[in-house]
């Protein structure tokens, strides 16, 4: 995730905070509710003084008319169904009192609290954990917490008992019913509450198990749940939902995908920075979802329909999506944003972590300011003992309860930064001896990554790091890996983009990329530690990469100041979609060249949603705020392109799957790989070389020959001599469809092959400018 996509989010937090801070739940005053508590005063000591200071009022609990109440247990955290009731447990170090608020779904809509139960510190607190056990009717019941304690931002505390806070461990969070639609009070931050779990019928997994596909064999497809089926051309009953994705999985199966990487599906507020867009005449929203509210809760508004139990519906439909994907041999990886939350900076809304224990969950500077390594206002304190346990519990939950197969960690380098050392010795100016580790300092053996890597449950899942952050930490090739972490290889993207467009000086670096980047992944790591990609949600789509030299982000409402400026793109001679026929032909050729480079490289290829048919966002390389055509998969366009680029992509993915040599478990050696230039076995690695070719021994195909000519000049290539065999064309990106891929079932295949024969009889091949080829060995038949 690029920091720029969040840049506007905390510009609006000041405005939203006013709305949110006034949006509290009034206490019930109706005559049929009798007072629940009898107040008594207590006092607590200030951390910097021995004098007692009366800072809170704790109410002595009485019996509830609705629920049987007992002490409860401090573990596990969150709500847990047991003994015909629910145990609630929440960690809060610095609070002095806690109240659990129970809210019926109907009362939530009316801004009411149904019942409040004050917890007794002598019975309902163990260490720093508040807990209580309740038995009663929890049908359609929600909950939240009030905490009291110091409100002292300069000390890192934001306690305010007027706020009802979300449980960090909540399994489902309820707010608005419909995606992107304001409630009757026009509040962008509506009241939220956590679903109380009940002992319902167990989900039928039908024996579903994790697929555990070898990572070297993966072809990953990065996608957005809502964007995948929201467009009307999807022609499904519930567009923009988990169910919609499940219905369209056969498209991915047809393409050859065996792993989907879901952009954030944790609960987030899509109206976080809701504002009118004067350019498009619609509203800016948080479409991508990189601003989490609840890490255990699936995004509720991705459910197929709202109902009294649409939280449960969302959980079940996410499970159905995973189950249906597994039936088709497709793994599911979640993009998790464990680097910051939606609570923004010091002026942001307070709805969970900040009110529960701000100084624990966030990296704070000595005077309470938020460190902003995420670029989104705050930074999750990942290596604090409590927070890293939270992260571990969260990941375990999604693996064991939701059956996901792995995680991609957004801005994963933040997990390698040191945690806040929040105590008087280093924060409040007390004299200390020696140097202290500055909060956020990169550390070589981060405890949270160590825990994840060696956890017995998580050890077998896919772990992918976006190995950089917005604070300048760039760890591609150097992320703490324990031998199991893969990385989004941003260097692969940049090198391949520059070589394919014909930039001098990249032939050697391009060759490294083709081999799986062994220059980066050393120390026992494998090619599959590199997640190779040309395009992702950040940046240009593949079609825009060959159409625009410059970003076109005016529609984002930030005067084109957001988004990446260094895209290494090339418009092929004319800027924008309206171009000459010759330019459009070259663009299609370049798209094919990029896809060939992705499919013949060692490592794990990743494709961005829509690139398989040439989706365009009109040159916008930062579409985080658009719930419209820019981010919607166009099923009608996919059908139009079915015999063109989609066919090309499908055939190349199938070819990669068939070739044993294109998904190696180890980096290729000279026994298998041979480099060539315009003449066999004479590669040219000079600064001006724009030609790279190699042959690869393959146990299935015997041998394959791949060449890239990124020069503006055509050339004649001499091929390696293989006695008894002839090279035959399989892919030539300079040819129009369907002759760009000569498959056995291609009509007029023999006619097409004859066009090459006189060249191949001479063991040469004519390559046009900006083209790539794949040749296969075929035995010469006796006349």
UniProtKB/Swiss-Prot annotation:
Annotated catalytic residues: 410, 466
Subcellular location per the Swiss-Prot or TrEMBL entry: Plastid, Chloroplast
Transit peptide: 1-43
Disruption phenotype: Strong reduction of the starch level in leaves, but 50-fold increase of water-soluble polysaccharides. No alteration of the amylase-to-amylopectin ratio. Absence of starch granules in the hypocotyl endodermis associated with reduced hypocotyl negative gravitropism but normal phototropism, and presence of some starch granules in the root columella, leading to axillary branches with wider branch angles.
Biological process, per Gene Ontology: amylopectin biosynthetic process; starch biosynthetic process; starch catabolic process
Site (Transition state stabilizer): 538
The keyword tRNA-binding appears for this protein: no
SMART domains to which the protein is assigned, alphabetical: Aamy
Involved pathway(s): Glycan biosynthesis; starch biosynthesis
Record carries keyword Ligase: no
GO (cellular component) term, any one: chloroplast
Catalytic activity: Hydrolysis of (1->6)-alpha-D-glucosidic branch linkages in glycogen, amylopectin and their beta-limit dextrins
GO molecular function: isoamylase activity
Record's keyword terms, sorted: Carbohydrate metabolism, Chloroplast, Glycosidase, Hydrolase, Plastid, Starch biosynthesis, Transit peptide
Known EC number: 3.2.1.68
InterPro entries, sorted: GlgX_Isoamylase_N_E_set, Glyco_hydro_13_cat_dom, Glyco_hydro_13_N, Glyco_hydro_b, Glycoside_hydrolase_SF, Ig-like_fold, Ig_E-set, ISOA1-3-like_C
Recorded family membership: Belongs to the glycosyl hydrolase 13 family.
Complexes and interactors: Associates with ISA2 to form the heteromultimeric complex Iso1 required for amylopectin synthesis.
Biological role stated in the UniProt entry: Involved in the trimming of pre-amylopectin chains. Accelerates the crystallization of nascent amylopectin molecules during starch synthesis. ISA1 and ISA2 work exclusively together as a multimeric holoenzyme. ISA1-ISA2 removes preferentially branches that are very close to other branches. Promotes negative gravitropic responses in shoots by facilitating starch granules (statoliths) formation in hypocotyls.
Note: In the absence of ISA2, ISA1 may be unstable.
Name by which UniProt lists this protein: Isoamylase 1, chloroplastic
Organism name: Arabidopsis thaliana
Gene of this entry: ISA1
């Amino acid at each position: 995730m690029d920091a720029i996509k969040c840049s506007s989010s905390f510009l609006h937090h000041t405005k939203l905070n006013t709305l949110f801070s006034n949006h509290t739940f009034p206490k019930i005053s109706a005559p049929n509710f009798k007072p629940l508590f009898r107040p008594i005063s207590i006092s607590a000591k200030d951390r910097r003084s021995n004098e007692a200071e009366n800072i809170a009022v704790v109410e002595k609990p009485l019996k509830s008319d609705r629920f049987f109440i007992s002490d409860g247990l401090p573990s596990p955290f969150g709500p847990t169904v047991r003994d015909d009731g629910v145990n609630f447990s929440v960690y809060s170090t610095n609070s002095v009192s806690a109240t659990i608020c129970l809210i019926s779904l109907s009362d939530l809509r009316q801004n009411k609290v149904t019942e409040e139960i004050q917890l007794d510190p002598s019975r309902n607190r163990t260490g720093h954990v508040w807990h209580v056990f309740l038995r009663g009717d929890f049908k359609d019941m929600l909950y939240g917490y009030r905490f009291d304690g110091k409100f002292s931002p300069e000390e890192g505390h934001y306690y305010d008992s007027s706020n009802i806070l979300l449980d960090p461990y909540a399994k489902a969070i309820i707010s608005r019913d419909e995606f992107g639609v304001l409630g009757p009070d026009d509040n962008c931050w509506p009241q939220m509450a956590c679903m109380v779990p009940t002992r319902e019928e167990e989900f039928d997994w039908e024996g579903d198990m994790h697929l555990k596909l070898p990572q070297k064999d993966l072809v990953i497809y990065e996608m957005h749940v809502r964007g995948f089926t929201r467009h009307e051309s999807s022609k499904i009953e519930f567009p923009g939902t988990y169910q919609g994705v499940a219905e369209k999985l056969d498209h991915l199966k047809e393409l050859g995908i065996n792993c989907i990487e879901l952009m954030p599906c944790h609960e987030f507020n899509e109206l976080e920075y809701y504002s009118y867009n004067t350019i498009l005449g619609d509203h800016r929203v948080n479409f991508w979802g990189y601003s989490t509210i609840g890490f255990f809760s699936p995004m509720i508004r991705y459910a197929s329909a709202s109902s009294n139990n649409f939280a449960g519906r969302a959980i079940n439909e996410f499970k159905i999506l995973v189950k249906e994907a597994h039936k088709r041999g497709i793994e599911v990886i979640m993009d998790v944003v464990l680097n910051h939350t939606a609570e923004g900076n010091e002026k942001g809304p307070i709805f969970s972590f900040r009110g529960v224990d701000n100084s624990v969950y966030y990296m704070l500077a000595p005077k309470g300011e938020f460190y902003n390594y995420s670029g989104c206002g705050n930074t999750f304190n990942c290596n604090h003992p409590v927070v890293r346990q939270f992260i571990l519990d969260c990941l375990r939950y999604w693996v064991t309860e939701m059956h996901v197969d792995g995680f991609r960690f957004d801005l994963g380098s933040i997990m390698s930064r040191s945690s806040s050392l929040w105590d008087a010795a280093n924060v409040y100016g007390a004299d200390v001896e020696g140097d202290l580790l500055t909060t956020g300092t990169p550390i070589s053996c981060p405890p949270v990554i160590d825990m994840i890597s060696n956890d017995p449950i998580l050890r077998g899942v896919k772990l992918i790091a976006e190995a950089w952050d917005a604070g300048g930490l760039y760890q591609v090739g150097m992320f703490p890996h324990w031998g199991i972490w893969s990385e989004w290889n941003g260097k692969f993207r940049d090198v391949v983009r520059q070589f394919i467009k014909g930039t001098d000086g990249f032939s050697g670096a391009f060759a490294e990329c083709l081999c799986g980047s062994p220059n980066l992944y050393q120390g026992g790591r494998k090619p599959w530690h590199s997640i190779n990609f040309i395009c992702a949600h950040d940046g240009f789509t593949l079609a825009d990469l060959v159409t625009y030299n410059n970003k076109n982000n005016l529609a984002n409402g930030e005067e084109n100041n957001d988004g990446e400026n260094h895209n290494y793109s090339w418009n092929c001679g004319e800027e924008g979609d309206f171009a000459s026929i010759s330019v459009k032909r070259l663009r299609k050729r370049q798209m094919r060249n990029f896809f060939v480079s992705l499919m013949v490289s060692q490592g794990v290829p990743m494709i961005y949603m829509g690139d398989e048919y040439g989706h365009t966002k009109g040159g916008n390389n930062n579409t985080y705020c658009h719930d419209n055509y820019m981010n919607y998969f166009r099923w009608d366009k996919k059908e139009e392109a079915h015999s063109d680029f989609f066919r090309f992509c499908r055939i190349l993915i199938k070819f990669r799957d068939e070739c044993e040599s294109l998904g190696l478990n180890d980096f290729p050696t000279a026994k298998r790989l041979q480099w060539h230039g315009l003449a066999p076995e004479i590669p040219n690695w000079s600064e001006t070389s724009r030609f790279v070719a190699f042959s690869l021994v393959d146990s299935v195909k015997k041998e394959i020959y791949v060449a890239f000519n990124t020069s503006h000049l055509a050339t004649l290539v001499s091929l390696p001599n293989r006695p008894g065999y002839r090279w035959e064309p399989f892919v030539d990106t300079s040819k129009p469809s369907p002759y760009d891929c000569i498959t056995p079932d291609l009509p007029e295949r023999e006619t097409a092959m004859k066009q090459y024969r006189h060249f191949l009889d001479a063991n040469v091949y004519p390559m046009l400018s900006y083209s790539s080829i794949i040749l296969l060995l075929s035995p010469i038949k006796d006349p």
